[in-house]
Amino acid sequence: MKTHSNDGNNTNGENGNNSYDVIIIGGGPAGATAGIYTARANLKTLIIDKGLTAGALGITSKIANYPGISGEIGGAELLQIMRDQAQSFGVKFISERVIGVDLLSETKSVFTNTDSFSARAVIIATGSMGRVNRIPGEERLLGRG
């Protein structure tokens, strides 16, 4: 991820539409959980994520051992439950790719392909996707245990 300097040409503007207390990069379990805690602390929170199936949980087809969930559930379905809970506390989610950040200033900036956002704090919760496929046919088994 490249770092940008804040040259004043972003869309944060004076109206504060893109200004938050906390921006969380990554909307998986860690990002959603962080969002729940920050929103419950009355902090205006934005989660920027590439999409519901961008992370390891989102592509997992079956989970049978998650606390509080009886039976089996798909990873994307479990992730949606987490996101719904975060949204119920006021977290805003957007689907974007983060292309850069400026974390050196007191007000932090996060840049996406189409916009920029500012916050007092940035949490990076990008998770993991592991290694790339190395065995022919591996992609058809990905997320199946």
Regions found by a protein language model. Give the residues of each.
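FAD-binding core/adjacent interface of flavoenzyme oxidoreductases
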Residues: 1-25, 41, 93-145
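Beta1-alpha1 glycine-rich phosphate/pyrophosphate-binding loop at the start
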Residues: 20-89
